[in-house]
A protein has these predicted regions:
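HTH-adjacent hinge/linker in prokaryotic transcriptional regulators
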Residues: 1-32
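Residue-identity detector for glutamine
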Residues: 7, 25-27, 34, 103, ...
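Short hydrophobic/aromatic-rich motifs at helix boundaries and adjacent loops
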Residues: 7-9, 32-35, 79-80, 137-139
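Residues that form generic nucleotide/phosphate-binding pockets
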Residues: 20-24, 39, 170
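Glycine-rich phosphate/diphosphate-binding loops that line cofactor/substrate pockets in enzymes
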Residues: 31-43
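Secondary-structure transition/capping residues
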Residues: 32, 47, 178-179
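Glycine-rich phosphate-binding loops that contact phosphosugars or nucleotide phosphates
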Residues: 41-175
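A short, charged, Gly/Pro-tolerant segment at domain boundaries
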Residues: 174-182
Length: 182
């Protein structure tokens, strides 16, 4: 049996999760997801970018999107040279809790300048990454930092994984030019 002190702690943690799942049931959230899907269906390849915890989620997102038939890859090194030429058929999904990570902003801006559409998934809508994006999906969960040290960000990525899987499922079965690769 769980003690009342332990139960209270669990309930506090679940409040943020519950709030997030209530927000995803809104019409505005559904429209935001559809806007992202519309941008992605115009692309022949999808690039995920992020640093730190977001880079690992980007790798997961790329794998998930490949599983549903969309050619995707993750750039986990922010100093990777950006392709030369035009990127009209490329979509970028930039992941960042703060939306202010310098390396992610730099890479997203380079890709956008090359013609890539830019979808960002951030914790808040009023951040630099969201403002430069063609579409921003924000999730508003409580940020959790170990001892308030920026190097130990323990903010839950559950919302980001849910959003990526939701978009991936929407893309499943939608025809794109990479269908012959799979």
């Amino acid at each position: 049996e769980v003690s009342s002190k332990e139960q209270k702690k669990i309930n506090m943690d679940l409040t943020a999760v519950k709030d997030f799942f209530e927000r995803v049931q809104t019409q505005a959230f559904a429209e935001n997801i559809q806007e992202a899907v519309k941008l992605l269906t115009k692309a022949s390849s999808i690039i995920f970018v992020g640093v730190g915890n977001s880079s690992f989620i980007g790798k997961y997102g790329a794998r998930y999107f490949n599983n549903v038939g969309w050619f995707s890859f993750a750039i986990d090194d922010p100093f990777t040279p950006v392709f030369r030429g035009k990127g009209e058929r490329i979509a970028t999904i930039a992941l960042s809790v703060s939306g202010e990570t310098e390396q992610t902003l730099m890479l997203a801006e380079k890709l956008k300048r090359r013609g890539s559409s830019l979808i960002s998934i951030t914790n808040k809508a009023n951040c630099s990454l969201a403002k430069m994006s063609d579409c921003n999906i924000n999730y508003y969960v409580s940020e959790y930092k170990y001892k308030q040290d920026e190097d130990y960000d323990l903010t839950s990525q559950m919302a980001v994984v849910f959003i990526l899987e939701l978009i991936g499922r929407e893309l499943k079965g939608v025809h794109n030019d990479t269908d012959d690769l799979f």
